[in-house]
Amino acid sequence: MAVYFVTGKLGSGKTLVSVGKIQDKIVAGCKIATNLDLRLQNLPQVGRFAKTPRVLRIPDKPSISDLLAIGRGNDSYDENKNGLLVLDECGTWFNTRSWNDKERQPIIDWFLHARKLGWDIIFLVQDLSIVDKQARSALAEHVVYCRRLDRITLPFVGTLYSLVTGSKMPLPKLHVGVVKYGDSQLSPTVERWLYTGKNLYNAYDTKQAFSSNYDSGVYSYLTPYLSHGRYFKPLNLGQKMKLTKIYLKKFSRVLCLAIGFASAFTYSYITQPKPEVKKVVSQTYDFDKFTIDSSQRLNLSYRYVFKDSKGKLINSDDLQKQGYSITYIDLCTVSIKKGNSNEIVKCN
């Protein structure tokens, strides 16, 4: 079983990375229980047509009866199939006063024995220091420190950008959760959770307020198919054209830039002069009247200069380019072959 304390300042992405882990567990077919208000149909990897997610909504501050009601998270011995329990605003549960509260003791005991019930747990707190030391020692197997990369200023480049534009250099909204094995920042890093903000913002209520007077008990979310998918109607041609116009208007600048680059590349490719290919014209020769005018030997290679009946000199390299095969016999005798023709040429 894995227990995570996810920490970070306000807006650092604690809930977002936790919803990302919920999505991963749903895709793996695992059971989920949480006090977060989720919109399952907006999870990118789940979608509105999913029929199998098993997600339970528990009260904002669950009692022991609520935790007992969610049952087992995994009936097998394979811990990769463990269910995931995600609880936000846990700072009020694990401070020194609450840790020794007799009414909260059964809940704490349940957390200590959650492994036997097949549950992985994610606790969300703003800072680990507000958690009682005994609770940290007993439960904080992993501690996750959340950071938002768009709030970080790049050295030199960010300063130069601010001087030129007068504003902070925009960076992608990437949320990073650094997972430490232990409750110290010096503990070894075991993994990093990386999630982009935009595709998960609509999957949960970012303005959810937690209350001790939550009036509903434990209930199960409807699957996305039952709540949204079965009511989906395919778009007709007019609606598709309307969406096309909207997206073309939205991405018109990028599209025009891409078309400009493509047009310039195509024009340069078409108008580029093609290299001239030298064609070697094969001629026929009367090798009966050829004689070897000179010969040259360099290591294992030979070169000959032939003379025809008119006194014209032709070297062996030109003949080979025209497809003739020249076989050395001796410095004064060669065999010239092409196709079925084979002639012996000697010195004069």
UniProtKB/Swiss-Prot annotation:
Species of origin: Enterobacteria phage fd
Ligand binding (ATP): G8, K9, L10, G11, S12, G13, K14, T15
Claim: Disulfide bond is one of the keywords in the record: no
Keyword annotations of the record: ATP-binding, Host membrane, Membrane, Nucleotide-binding, Signal-anchor, Transmembrane, Transmembrane helix, Viral extrusion, Viral release from host cell
GO MF terms held by the record: ATP binding
Localisation: Host membrane
Protein name: Gene 1 protein
Complex formation: Interacts with G4P; this interaction results in a complex that spans the inner an outer host membranes.
Membrane protein topology class: Single-pass membrane protein
Family of this protein: Belongs to the inovirus G1P protein family.
Pfam families (alphabetical): Zot
